């Protein structure tokens, strides 16, 4: 159907109208733009008559219509791009005057979120004529987009910037902020992560906001999570702290000779995962000055049996030194590519001016090395050693360092903020540990967990960041962390002024961390007794059985009444006794005036093993010989004289040892392996729930009379005694299921409930309530009859839970978990993944998850490759296993995959390293596929 608006159709219509209706009708048709659907051959000559006067109009209409179409299409594209980026800018205010963002691009690029026009509009709307941009990436753009206020720094990728450049940029930023209180600095690199973060962190140190790298890094993690600072970045932040200290340290200019490099043990980078073929590159800044890479066949391949890698270097360096080691492998077996490729094993970077003059060895452990992102390829105790020698003569330098003759005493940190309140909030935020940082102490003390509180090894206090200013190059006596960067074999003390990161320099306020103060004695239960200074180290042997029983029933031994009134007698169930690795003096009550409503922790309401307060002359077994009442039985009045021992988790600021019997959190679980419940300690054969707290206890002269009826029929007709408030030890019998049975006029509750009965008559039917009953000490703790154990299946099945909860807290601090239904890692592999996720880049972790179980399986990798491609990749279409049956199909799909992920096509892109890793895994799998003869799937 002809479009009446088309220029060609309009001209044809004009010719037909002129031939049919004459000159006047032709003019009317021309003005109206009408067209006739009928064209007869006899009137064809009219077309040629029209050309003379209508040719100009023909091309004019074509031009106008084309212009309108292009304008409409362009406006639609611009609107779609604006809607895509609007409100989705990668833009972070670290402070009100320091801004971090990702790279702004001129055109539409899927890999970048920020468009130059959007960023410029945003900055002009808020900081017009008061902002300058610092481009840290080697990639550039038109500076006119930001009014020509762009500083091109061109920092290298995947390494720390030179110390000279880092200091100079910080000084430039400070001068810009000093010119006008409204000025702001906008910092960006390719992704707005590592390079931008080290500059902002160095700026915090430059402005004297922080004197150590730790708070600066924590603030960056809080403001912009996932910054991904490498050990070299942290090392250079430490250098900045030394340069800007109260008594600044000035790096020397003496050359450094690297004699050799030793790596031990041998990492696993070859296809067999039993060695590597290494070579080493040495760079000064971005310039490579030495490499040991030669012909592939002439290079030595080290195996695990060799124990270490030794490569002589004998190269002299000065300034920012980078040492990188690579594994060389050949892809000659591949038909697609016949060339040699490399994989980085590690990289380290340091400044030679911070090496002490008498240093001969530099040692780097795995946490102090860059690019160690695949833990499976590095054996345990992996370390790198550099044999070095510092030359005695200074080397003449061309450029004067920017820190020479620069005084930072007048620098005010308030220049980074717009208000005093913002300054205080930022300082508080820098003192908090970020959520995504790995904890310094991964061992988590469970609530009331006894074994979790034991000192299995010496715990050393975490070194402050101030003491870490030069710790990068000396051996430290403390535990290693991510911020301790280098260790040396040189002695700690040196009389000369040249010191490394962490070394002790003259005039530097630095000293060894003092011993932690003794834990504050806090009277959590309001006992306010007299202080006791018992020498816990004098306990030479564990107490005997008689001493255990004496302490169990409230006594302190048989040595005399003088010890009975002493509050600091060692309780064998307390960690300060012989079984504890820590000794903490305790306060014990001298009166029964504790608050009856005080609850410290969840399980501290009742401690059956705590010694009750009593006069010095009181009989040890007086609570069992006199007439029982609710006011005299410590087992029936848990709040009358509470135990001074509470859970360690009740308050984190006080070091209080947990109770070994009541602190295992067994008071909330059935089948606890203990003796702390009311039922087990006082009346195991009473009511099905134990003795009510308001009922008087029958008088007896035998404290063990309650144990005499353990084998009676009444005991055999009910399930295991439920655990009481203290987390008790039920009678030793097979695990039974709770079943409702009428016993003593009450209804039995399932075992393990936190219970307190209010009934007043359940003890009238107890068979042992009569004093004439003789205790039976020959009781047999036999299992419940089979028929009895099957009764409770209809109500509550607790057998499985009972077994699972018995030893739940024994190994909780080591990452083991007894409950399968709880969240968290249940296998070693999951725990390893959880640790890897804390330190590893998410993209590289995604690669590991992709190849897990599919190593060198070309079909499995190709069929799942769509799950690991970077965002925005649309060329690759997912394939199924049905498309990879024959070798020809595999070859075709593999070639198509290589065209998508080849590293040469990703040069300069942020996903270049990511594409390289995918390509190498596919290449390994293809080589394995060829070596196996390219067999079909079936």
Swiss-Prot record:
**Gene knockout outcome:** Mice have a high rate of early postnatal mortality, although surviving pups have a normal life span despite decreased body weight. Knockout animals have impaired synaptic vesicle recycling, with an increased number of clathrin-coated vesicles, and impaired clathrin-mediated endocytosis of synaptic vesicles in neuronal culture. There is an up-regulation of Gak, but this does not fully compensate for the lack of the protein.
The enzyme class is hydrolase
EC number(s) recorded for this UniProt protein: 3.1.3.-
User: Residue limits of the Phosphatase tensin-type domain?
Assistant: 80-247
Any single GO BP term: clathrin-dependent endocytosis
> What's written under domain?
The J domain mediates interaction with HSPA8/HSC70 and is required for basket dissociation.
Q: How does it assemble?
A: Forms a complex composed of HSPA8, CLTC and DNAJC6. Interacts with HSPA8/HSC70 in an ATP-dependent manner; this interaction stimulates the HSPA8's ATPase activity. Interacts with CLTC; this interaction produces a local change in heavy-chain contacts, creating a detectable global distortion of the clathrin coat. Interacts with AP2A2. Interacts with DNM1(GTP-bound form); this interaction allows clathrin-coated vesicle (CCV) formation at the plasma membrane.
What protein name is recorded for this chain?
Auxilin
Task: List the source organism.
Answer: Mus musculus
- This protein's encoding gene: Dnajc6
């Amino acid at each position: 159907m002809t479009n009446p608006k088309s220029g060609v159709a309009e001209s044809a219509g004009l010719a037909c109208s002129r031939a049919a209706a004459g000159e006047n009708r032709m003019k009317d048709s021309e003005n109206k733009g009408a067209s006739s659907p009928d064209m007869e051959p006899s009137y064809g000559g009219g077309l040629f008559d029209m050309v003379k006067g209508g040719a100009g109009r023909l091309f004019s209409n074509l031009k106008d219509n084309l212009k309108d179409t292009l304008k409409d299409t362009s406006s639609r594209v611009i609107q779609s791009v604006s809607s895509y980026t609007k409100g989705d800018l990668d833009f972070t205010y670290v402070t009100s005057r320091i801004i971090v963002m990702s790279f702004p691009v001129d055109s539409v690029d899927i890999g970048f979120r920020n468009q130059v026009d959007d960023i410029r509009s945003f900055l002009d709307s808020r900081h017009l004529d008061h902002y300058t941009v610092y481009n840290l990436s080697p990639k550039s753009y038109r500076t006119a987009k930001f009014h020509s206020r762009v500083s091109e720094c061109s920092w290298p990728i995947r390494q720390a910037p030179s110390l000279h450049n880092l200091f100079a940029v910080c000084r430039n930023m400070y001068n810009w902020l000093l010119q006008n209180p409204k000025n702001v600095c906008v910092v960006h690199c390719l992704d707005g992560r590592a390079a931008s973060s080290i500059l902002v962190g160095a700026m915090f140190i430059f402005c004297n906001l922080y004197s150590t790298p730790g708070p600066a890094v924590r603030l960056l993690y809080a403001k912009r999570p996932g910054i991904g600072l490498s050990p070299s970045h942290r090392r250079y932040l430490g250098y900045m702290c030394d340069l800007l200290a109260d008594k600044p340290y000035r790096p020397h200019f003496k050359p450094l000779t690297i004699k050799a490099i030793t790596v031990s043990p041998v990492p696993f980078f070859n296809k067999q995962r039993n060695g590597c073929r290494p070579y080493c590159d040495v760079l000064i800044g971005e310039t490579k000055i030495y490499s040991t890479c030669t012909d592939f066949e002439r290079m030595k391949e080290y195996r695990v049996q060799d124990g270490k890698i030794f490569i002589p270097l004998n190269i002299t360096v000065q300034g920012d030194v980078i040492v990188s080691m690579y594994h060389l492998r050949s892809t000659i077996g591949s038909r697609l590519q016949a060339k040699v490729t490399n994989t980085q094993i590690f990289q380290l970077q340091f400044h030679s001016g911070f090496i002490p003059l008498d240093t001969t060895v530099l040692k780097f452990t795995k946490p102090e090395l860059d690019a160690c992102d695949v833990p499976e390829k590095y054996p345990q105790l992996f370390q790198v050693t550099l044999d070095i020698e510092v030359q005695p003569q200074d080397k003449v330098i061309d450029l004067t360092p920017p820190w020479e003759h620069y005084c930072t005493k007048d620098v005010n940190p308030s220049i980074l903020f717009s208000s005093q309140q913002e300054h205080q909030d930022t300082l508080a935020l820098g003192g908090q540990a970020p959520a995504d940082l790995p904890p310094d102490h991964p061992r988590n003390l469970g609530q009331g967990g006894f074994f979790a509180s034991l000192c299995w090894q010496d715990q050393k206090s975490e070194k402050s960041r101030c003491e870490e200013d030069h710790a990068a190059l000396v051996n430290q006596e403390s535990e290693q962390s991510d911020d301790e960067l280098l260790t040396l074999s040189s002695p700690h003390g040196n009389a000369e002024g040249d010191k490394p990161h962490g070394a002790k320099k003259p005039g530097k306020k630095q000293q060894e961390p003092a011993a932690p103060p003794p834990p504050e004695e806090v009277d959590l239960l309001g006992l306010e007794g007299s202080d006791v200074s018992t020498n816990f180290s004098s306990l030479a042997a564990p107490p005997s059985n008689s001493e255990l029983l004496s302490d169990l029933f409230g006594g302190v031994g048989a040595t005399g009444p003088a010890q009975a009134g002493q509050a600091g007698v060692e309780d064998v169930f307390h960690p300060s006794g012989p079984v504890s690795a820590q000794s903490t003096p305790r306060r014990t009550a001298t009166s029964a005036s504790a608050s009856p409503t005080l609850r410290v922790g969840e399980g501290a309401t009742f401690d059956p093993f705590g010694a009750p307060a009593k006069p010095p002359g009181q009989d040890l077994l007086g609570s069992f010989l006199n007439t029982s009442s609710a006011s005299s039985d410590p087992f029936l009045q848990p709040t009358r004289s509470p135990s001074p021992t509470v859970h360690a988790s009740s308050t984190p600021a006080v070091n209080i040892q947990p109770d070994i019997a009541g602190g295992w959190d067994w008071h909330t679980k059935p089948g606890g392996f203990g003796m702390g419940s009311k039922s087990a300690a006082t009346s195991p054969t009473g009511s099905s729930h134990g003795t009510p707290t308001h009922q008087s206890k029958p008088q007896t002269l035998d404290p063990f009379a309650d144990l005499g009826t353990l084998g009676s029929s009444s005991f055999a007709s009910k399930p295991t005694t439920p655990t009481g408030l203290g987390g008790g030890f039920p009678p030793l019998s097979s695990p039974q299921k709770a079943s409702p049975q009428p016993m003593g006029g009450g209804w039995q509750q399932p075992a393990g409930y936190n219970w307190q009965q209010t009934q007043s008559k359940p003890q009238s039917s107890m068979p042992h309530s009569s004093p004439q009953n003789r205790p039976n000490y020959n009781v047999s703790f036999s299992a419940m009859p089979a028929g009895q154990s099957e009764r409770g299946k209809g109500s509550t099945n607790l057998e499985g839970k009972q077994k699972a909860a018995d030893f739940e807290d024994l190994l909780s601090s080591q990452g083991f978990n007894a409950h399968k239904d709880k969240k968290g890692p249940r296998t070693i592999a999951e725990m390893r993944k959880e640790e890897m996720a804390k330190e590893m880049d998410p993209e590289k972790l995604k690669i590991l998850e992709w190849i897990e179980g599919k190593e060198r399986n070309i079909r499995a990798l190709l069929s799942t490759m769509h799950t690991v491609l970077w965002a925005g990749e649309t060329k690759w279409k997912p394939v199924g296993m049905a498309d990879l049956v024959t070798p020809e199909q595999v070859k075709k799909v593999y070639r198509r995959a290589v065209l998508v992920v080849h590293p040469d096509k990703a040069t300069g892109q942020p996903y270049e390293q990511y594409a390289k890793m995918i390509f190498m895994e596919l290449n390994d799998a293809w080589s394995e596929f060829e070596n196996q003869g390219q067999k079909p799937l079936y």
